[in-house]
């Protein structure tokens, strides 16, 4: 018989959607271990698996790639996956105030932030986060609205197939 005890949880949600709050609320109130996994940069699981399998050691991986590896090494039936989506107006206002992983050239003015090609970078080195591309085409998002639409679509249509 297969052990289906929930031992870990993970969260999928765009930046500024409440993932941090949800993580801490669960950890504070339940005896369960958190695995960051794909968290904000989700949908391109195969990209992360390819990078992980090509690495000779965990030292060659970014922190985020190591977090993904930790999640992938768990059996899905032992991981409770949460998905969180915030009201679109509140979300974009919050994201514009705190532009996590947004390239400097796309941060100002607001018109540029909402209308330019959207992609994510590692804040410490300005290198693009390839795992945060359009999960269907592997291209950058046309704009922040396409990012939101496709990530919501992934949460609704693809995530339930995995957990």
Describe these PLM feature segments.
Residues 102-137:
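A solvent-exposed, charged loop/short amphipathic helix patch at secondary-structure junctions
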């Amino acid at each position: 018989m297969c052990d289906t005890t929930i031992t870990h949880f993970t969260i999928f949600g765009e930046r500024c959607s409440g993932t941090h709050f949800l993580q801490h609320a669960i950890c504070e109130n339940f005896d369960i271990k958190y695995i960051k996994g794909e968290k904000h940069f989700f949908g391109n699981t195969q990209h992360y698996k390819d990078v992980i399998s090509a690495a000779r050691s965990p030292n060659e991986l970014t922190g985020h790639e190591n977090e993904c590896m930790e999640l992938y090494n768990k059996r899905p039936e032992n991981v409770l996956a949460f998905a969180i989506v915030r009201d679109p107006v509140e979300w974009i206002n919050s994201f514009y105030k705190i532009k996590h992983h947004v390239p400097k050239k796309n941060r100002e003015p607001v018109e540029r932030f909402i209308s330019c090609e959207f992609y994510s970078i590692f804040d410490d080195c300005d290198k693009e986060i390839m795992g945060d591309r359009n999960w269907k085409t592997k291209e950058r998002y046309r704009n922040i609205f396409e990012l939101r639409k496709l990530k919501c679509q992934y949460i609704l249509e693809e995530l339930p197939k995995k957990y």
